[in-house]
Structure formats: structure tokens, C-alpha cells
Amino acid sequence: MRILFMGTPEFAASYLDFLIQKKFNVVAVISQKDKPRGRGQKLLPTPVKEVAQKYGIPVFQPSKLNEEGLEIIENYRPDIGIVVAYGRLLRKPFLDAIPLYNVHTSLLPKYRGPAPMQRAIENGERVTGVTIFKISEGMDEGDIALQRAFELEECEPFGSVYEKFIKYGTELLQEFLRNYPVTLTPQDHSKATYAPKIEKKDLYVDFSKPAVEVRNKIRAYDPTPGVRTFLNDIEVKLYGACEIESNSQENIEPGTVVRIEKQSGDGVIKTIDGLLHIKYIQFPGKNKITFLSAKNGGLIKEGMVFRNLD
């Protein structure tokens, strides 16, 4: 079976590398345009393009998919297209040229849209999964080919969940391709939910919320891009939220550093309904360190308050 692979970021590159390692016949790759990346903002190839070039697979970055993409299909004659985080909606007539299947990081119809991994964590889901579906014109609305669910740990951060999506997603993709064609099942559109794009405003944590909600917010963006708040008007990032203690002391302002633990190094922060243990804090231009290290360095102490600027 001749495969056209479409994808752009590091996540998609892991899938392309997997397919090649498993000896699937990837005949061509389509990725988005190269963009400036890194501190120097140097124009660099997309991670998917780098993998394709590494293995000598023809890679294309068309501006107009309905023109150039159709030409690629005509020249390379793929039997199927596999799409992983390509980053653009696919439209007719390209959609009709070959069967196109997308690997989506949620159990559709839940969490349609661009940020399903983070939104599931943020909402406190304990089960999520991977869906392979046939692409249609509606966003993530196509018929389902295969799904695989897996559990999330209570304190599991995005970085760990991301790795699970690569492991279980690539395994599911292999199963799909080995058994293709498979029976398709229409989605129940009445049960659809949406996972909107992550905006900068989403990255600020509010300690006047319940402790579980604050923990899930920190988990969803740990280790990247990291949630933000302000300490003495300095923007800091927080990582490693886990243990929650009950606390009914209403006289303590939410966001207050109640204590810093010597054994674990955690900061214990007041929320509206409890105390949340947070392992790491990161100051501008510095690496993340434990709250205890920050205290020993004179950067933070008990009684200080995390606040968001209005």
C-alpha cells in the first residue's frame, strides 16, 4: 500500500518515523512551510520535513493544496493519505482524490478541534484516547475507523500524556494500516464537544479557583509552555502540581504561599478551598527550581502571594 503522509510538528514527525521504521511504504510527504524557530528565529524545516529528508522521501510544502496537492497525488499515486497534526483544514477536491484518514488525540466526538490533549487534562478527564477517522469537510466530524482509550493518572502532566499519545497512537495506526480497509462508524454529533486553540490568556492560573481546577490547569501545560502567575509583579511559571490538602481558613488569601516543605521542596499554596502542593517555580530567564531552592536563594518566602495582574 502506497502512503501519502501529511503532518508538520514534532508530534507528527514521531508518527512518520514510526511508519518508516515499520517498513510501511511512504511514497511522499506533505508538510507546512518552514517557519522561524528557536531563540535565533532561524528559518528551519518542519520536524516532519526533517524526518522525510533523513530517509530520502520526497517532501512537499504546497501553498495551494487543491492545486499542488492534486499534482503530488497524480505523480506519486498513493492509495491512502495519513494526516497527523498537519495544521490546515483539507477541502474538496483534494479530499476526494484519495481516502484521507486523520489521527486525532481524543475519543471523538469529544474534544474536536486543535487542542484536545491539553483541554482533556485541564478538564480533569481520567480517560482519554486516540481516534483514527476518515476526514470529511467538517472539523473532526468524519466516520470513525478505530479508537483506543487509556487512563490518565491524577497528577499526570502534559509531557507524560503526550508520550502516551505517541505510543498508543502509533500502535493504533499500525493496526489500522495492517487491517485496512476497516468498517467505519458514524460519529454521534449530539455528543460532540470542542477543544479550542490555546490562547495566551489560557496560561494564567487563578488561585481563587478550587484546588483540583488549579492543579489540572498546571498539569495541562507542564512542561510546555508552562502556566504563569505573578509574584511581586514578576511573571513566573509553575510546574509539578499534585497533592491537595483540605483547608478551611478563609482568612488566608488565595495564592498565598502558606509553607515551603523542607523534605519535598514543595511550595504549599492556598486556593479557594484547600492547599495545593507545587514542586517547581521558574523565574524569568532562569531554569525551574524547587520552591525550597527558591527560598534558600532569597527569591520567595512564606506569606508571599501569587496574583494575576488585571
From Swiss-Prot:
Keywords: Protein biosynthesis, Transferase. It catalyses: L-methionyl-tRNA(fMet) + (6R)-10-formyltetrahydrofolate = N-formyl-L-methionyl-tRNA(fMet) + (6S)-5,6,7,8-tetrahydrofolate + H(+). One of its GO terms (molecular function) is methionyl-tRNA formyltransferase activity. Signal peptide: none annotated. It holds the Pfam family Formyl_trans_N. It is an enzyme of class 2 (transferase). One of its GO terms (cellular component) is cytosol. (6S)-5,6,7,8-tetrahydrofolate binds at S106, L107, L108, P109. Belongs to the Fmt family. This is Methionyl-tRNA formyltransferase. It comes from Fervidobacterium nodosum (strain ATCC 35602 / DSM 5306 / Rt17-B1). The gene is fmt.
